[in-house]
Amino acid sequence: MARISTSSNRPVPTSSALRRQRERDDGGRSTRAPGHNTGLYGNQPGDPPTIRSTNTTVKRRYRPGTKALREIRRYQRSSELLIRKLPFARLVKEVAENYIGADYGIRWQSNAVLALQEACEAFLVHLLEDTNLCAIHAKRVTIMQKDIQLARRIRGNI
């Protein structure tokens, strides 16, 4: 035979007692402040879910080094030049003008400037690879000026 529970000896709470209990649980405020949503999807636990507007974008937060590794992989896959062509061409022309003199008026073929740029970028990439190895050898991950100096000294072109 099933047992039927009888009413307990606790009194039934009145509406004023319920209101006092709700204020106590609510921290003293009976109505929620607008914009103070803390539940799932920005709502209080009893509220119906609302749809967030589509124009609010949350900025993605990556762990330290994740974006750097992604950039390294992207640049290792690609074969395009990393230095912009026109600033490099201006630099080459300025250095040649300072070295030879402005009165000669040297002209440059675009292929000659492009060949110089390819050689410069290959040199810099190789130097930075050696510099990174020097930093790793020193149990560091950050390259420093002394790593570049050591790499150039070991290579023999100071």
From Swiss-Prot:
Residues 20-29 have a biased composition (Basic and acidic residues). Ubiquitinated. Is degraded through ubiquitin-mediated proteolysis when not protected by its association to the kinetochore. GO terms for molecular function: DNA binding; protein heterodimerization activity; structural constituent of chromatin. The keyword Nucleus applies. Residues 1-59 are annotated as: Disordered. Gene3D superfamilies: Histone, subunit A (1.10.20.10). Coiled coil: none annotated. InterPro entries: Histone-fold, Histone_H2A/H2B/H3, Histone_H3/CENP-A. Its main location: nucleus. Keywords: Centromere, Chromosome, DNA-binding, Nucleosome core, Nucleus, Ubl conjugation. Histone H3-like nucleosomal protein that is specifically found in centromeric nucleosomes. Replaces conventional H3 in the nucleosome core of centromeric chromatin that serves as an assembly site for the inner kinetochore. Required for recruitment and assembly of kinetochore proteins, mitotic progression and chromosome segregation. May serve as an epigenetic mark that propagates centromere identity through replication and cell division. This is Histone H3-like centromeric protein CSE4. The lineage of its organism: Eukaryota, Fungi, Dikarya, Ascomycota, Saccharomycotina.
